[in-house]
Amino acid sequence: MSLDITLYEYGPSRSKQARWALLECGLEFKSVSGIGILHSEELIKVNPMGKVPAVVINGEPLFEAAAICTYLADLAPEKGLIAPSGSRERALHLQWVSFALTEMEAYLWSNARNTFVLPKEQRISALIEQNNAAFLHAASVLEKVLAENDYLVGQRFSVTDILVGFTLNWGKGAKLLETFPNLQKYLERLKQRPHCTL
């Protein structure tokens, strides 16, 4: 099947996940990038929120990094980046991606909003401490899992690691992984991959 793929992306954002997945899948794509694309009329036609990442694949729009990366992996089954639908490993993919988004990334994003995204008068600095505590609790769960496993699903690299790895790398940048040696080793493994965008 011939694929016509356009990726809407901008530097330090979740669009790194989509780019990494495209590269791992070996799929050719066009890039529309730069800060000027954010909230533009062109991007809003693809993602009504005007945010990246977003893709158009054979004329069909799709947004949200987890959806994009999962779909891309399904489009390149020969790469073995995701288990078949209906398998336990596919359920584990959904489990860990949902876990990272709800139990970790949501708190990192709240910290960002209340540190530099929102205007000063709208920031709630009291949230930072409780957000960090929630993130650290979730990180302790992954620390135990990765003490016994090199990767999150099926003992091999998968699109799950692209999505969760991005969140953990964000946490590392916020200095929240300093007491988690297994998470740090996991990130180093991911960064060894030639297509890694972390």
What do the predicted segments below correspond to?
Residues 1-126:
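GST-like domain detector, emphasizing the conserved glutathione-binding G-site
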Residues 67, 182, 195:
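Residue-level recognition of oxygen-bearing side chains
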Residues 100-189:
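GST-like fold's C-terminal all-alpha helical module
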Residues 45, 164, 192:
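Phosphate-coordinating loops and pocket residues in cytosolic domains that bind phosphorylated ligands
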Residues 55, 161, 193:
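Conserved G/P- and acidic residue-centered "switch" motifs that form tight phosphate/ATP-binding loops
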